[in-house]
A protein has these predicted regions:
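Short, low-complexity Ser/Thr-rich regulatory SLiMs
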Residues: 187-191, 247-251, 327
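Active-site nucleotide/adenylate-binding loops and adjacent lid/helix of ATP-dependent enzymes
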Residues: 94-184, 188-233
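Active-site "cap" helix and flanking loop/linker of ATP-utilizing ligase/carboxylase catalytic domains
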Residues: 224-245, 250-251, 260-308, 312
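A short linear hydrophobic-aromatic micro-motif
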Residues: 114, 134-137, 169-174, 243-244, ...
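ATP-binding N-terminal substructure of ATP-dependent carboxylate-amine bond-forming enzymes
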Residues: 1-103, 107, 122
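Peripheral (often C-terminal) accessory segments that flank ATP-dependent C-N-forming ligase machineries
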Residues: 284-369
C-alpha cells in the first residue's frame, strides 16, 4: 500500500518513518523537494493547490493524508484516482476557518471562547463592546504558532489592531481567557470506527509557540471532559486519523481553543513515550489497520528546538535524551527539531525537563520557574 502525504514537513517525515516498518510506501507532494519529507521519501514537486499534481498523487496512492491543514479544500474535491482521502475534507474545512471551528464547537456543545465575526472597523468596535476587553483579534485563516493575532487590552488598541490585521479581513474577535494552564488531547479514530485517546498533554507556550510538553497530565475530571469533546468531533465528522484539540484550563473546566485535523507537535513525546506513537497510529488509521495501544511507557517531556539548534553533542552525552533534527535551515521562530525524555516518575520528569529546558531555551525556563 502507498500512502500519499500532502505536505512534506517534519510531521509528514515522522509519519513516513513510523509507517515504513509496517510495510507501507510513501509519496509526498510539496512545493520544495528540500524538505524534511524529502529526506525519507520521493516527492512530487509543485504547489499544494495544483490539481494536476494532486490528481497524480491520488492515482499513484491508495490513501492520501496531510501534514498541514491549510490546503484549500476546493483543490482536493473531486480528484481522479483510486485514493481515499483521510481525514475527511469536512474536518479540514472546519479547522481552516476559525469562525467555522467555533461554530462547530458550539454545535457539539463543546465549551469555547465568546467570539464574533469581524469584517470592518465598525464591526470590530461592536464586537469589543459586546464581548469586552481584553480580547484577541485573529485572522480567520492561516493562523498558527501565534501568527495573525493582535491582543487588545483597552479601547485605545482598536486602531492599532485594525491597522495590523484589517487588510486580512474577514477576522474573528474573541475574549482573552484567564487560564491556569494549557492542555491538549490527541485522539485517533480508525476506518472501522474504533477510537483511542492518548493521555492529556500539559503544554507551555511562549510568543505563541509551543515550547514544552509533559505527559501524562493526570486529572480524571479534565480527561473525561477532553475525551468527551474529542469523541463528539470524531463522530460528527466520521473522522479517520489523528485529531488534536487544544484547551485552556479555566476554573477547573476546559475551554476549547482550536482543533488540528492531523498529528500534532504536543504529541511528539509519543515516539519514545507511548506504546504506539501518534504518527504510527495515524498511518494505521488512514490505511484501515487496527489501532495500536496509546498507553504511556512512563512520564515524558518534549522540548522544542526553535530558531537555532543547541550543540548536539551536549544533548547526546546525557543518558535518556532523544534528539530529533528535522534538517531545516535556521530561522527565528522556526521549529528545527525537538528533544524528548522518559522517566519513571512525574517528579523525575519535571526536574530533568526543567534542567534541559534551562540549557536549550532559557527565556522559557525563566518564565515558568
Amino acid at each position: 500500500m502507498t500512502v500519499g502525504i500532502v505536505g512534506a514537513g517534519q510531521l509528514g517525515r515522522m509519519m513516513a518513518l513510523a509507517g515504513y516498518p509496517l510495510g507501507f510506501d510513501f509519496l509526498f507532494l510539496d512545493k520544495d523537494a528540500r524538505t524534511p519529507g524529502g529526506q525519507v521519501g520521493p516527492i512530487l514537486e509543485g504547489a499544494l493547490t495544483d490539481r494536476e499534481l494532486l490528481g497524480r498523487l491520488c492515482e499513484r496512492c491508495d490513501v492520501v493524508t496531510f501534514d498541514w491543514e491549510n490546503i484549500p479544500v476546493e483543490a482536493l474535491q473531486g480528484l481522479p484516482g483510486k485514493a481515499r482521502i483521510a481525514p475527511p475534507l469536512r474536518a479540514l474545512a472546519a479547522a481552516q476557518d476559525r469562525l467555522s471551528e467555533k461554530r462547530t464547537f458550539e454545535l457539539l456543545g463543546i465549551a469555547t471562547t465568546r467570539y464574533a465575526a469581524v469584517d470592518s472597523r465598525t464591526t470590530l468596535e461592536t464586537a469589543v463592546q459586546t464581548i469586552g476587553l481584553p480580547g484577541v483579534l485573529k485572522t480567520r485563516t492561516l493562523g498558527y504558532d501565534g501568527k495573525g493575532q493582535f491582543v487588545l487590552r483597552t479601547s485605545a488598541d482598536l486602531d492599532a489592531a485594525w491597522e495590523a490585521l484589517g487588510k486580512a479581513a474577514p477576522l474573528l474577535y474573541e475574549n482573552l481567557v484567564p487560564f491556569d494552564r494549557e492542555v491538549s488531547i490527541i485522539a485517533v479514530r480508525g476506518l472501522d470506527g474504533a477510537v483511542a485517546f492518548y493521555p492529556l498533554n500539559l503544554n507551555v507556550h511562549r510568543a505563541g509557540i509551543l515550547r514544552l510538553t509533559r505527559a501524562p497530565f493526570v486529572n480524571a475530571t479534565l480527561t473525561r471532559q477532553a475525551q468527551r469533546a474529542a469523541r463528539r468531533l470524531l463522530e460528527h465528522f466520521n473522522y479517520v486519523g489523528v485529531l488534536t484539540i487544544e484547551f485552556f484550563v479555566s476554573r477547573g473546566k476546559l475551554i476549547a481553543n482550536e482543533m488540528a485535523p492531523r498529528v500534532h507537535n504536543s504529541g511528539h513525546w509519543t515516539i519514545e513515550g507511548a506504546v504506539t506513537s501518534q504518527f504510527e497510529n495515524h498511518v494505521r488509521a488512514v490505511a484501515g489497520m487496527p489501532l495500536g495501544s496509546t498507553q504511556p511507557r512512563g512520564h515524558s517531556a518534549m522540548i522544542n528546538l526553535i530558531g537555532e539548534l543547541p550543540a548536539r553533542e551536549a544533548i547526546l552525552t546525557q543518558p535518556g535524551l532523544h534528539w530529533h533534527d528535522y534538517g531545516k535551515s535556521a530561522r527565528p521562530g522556526r521549529k528545527l527539531g525537538h528533544v524528548t525524555l522518559v522517566e519513571t516518575t512525574a517528579r523525575q520528569r519535571d526536574l530533568r525537563s526543567y534542567k534541559v529546558l534551562g540549557r536549550i531555551d532559557r527565556a522559557t525556563w525563566l518564565a515558568i520557574r
